Amino acid sequence: MTTTAAGLRRTFTHDHVVTAPPDALFPLLCPVLEYAWIPTWECTLVHSVSGVAEHGCVFTTDFGDGEETWVCTTYRPPTAIEYTRVATGGWVTMLALALAPTEAGTALTVAQTFTAVTPQGECAVAAMDETVERDVWTDLSRLASVYLATGAMGPA
């Protein structure tokens, strides 16, 4: 077995609220449907039998820090969806989204585990900012709430 100096792992977990029930929110957690409510969303769908998110769905993104290949590894409507993302920059992200009903709508728990697989990835993972990651998901929760309330995309 060969080992590497990489392997740094960091996990960030945040709780958010979306003002709609889980069965309304869950379908939006999809690479195709995110175009309707996330102003900056872009992806290339590689594989999906249904044309939307499903177990085994594969797509790619590139938001300026290198391409990532996403695979949907858990698909349990309307309570859980997980994606594993492999970044060309040398890290893997496990993204787990858990949805639970509340009086306000949906409690959304976002858990992101970043694991470096190269020395370059180790630098990237070490530099990741938990506050930035939380703020991204706070904004996404706001955008989902706006879309589900109005049917229109909110401002970025």
Each language-model region and where it sits:
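Hydrophobic ligand-binding cavity/cleft-lining segments
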Residues: 1-50
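Hydrophobic-ligand-binding modules of eukaryotic lipid transfer/binding families
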Residues: 1-17, 137, 141, 145, ...
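Short secondary-structure boundary/capping segments
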Residues: 4-6, 50-51, 72-73, 98-100
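Intrinsic-disorder/low-complexity, polar/charged segments enriched in Ser/Thr/Lys/Arg/Asp/Glu/Gln
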Residues: 9-17, 58, 67, 80, ...
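A short, structured loop/turn motif at beta-sheet edges
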Residues: 19-23, 73-78, 98-107
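Glycine-rich portal/gate segments that line the openings of hydrophobic small-molecule binding cavities
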Residues: 33, 45-90, 145-155
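Beta-strand/loop substructures that line and gate deep hydrophobic ligand-binding cavities in soluble
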Residues: 87-138, 154-155
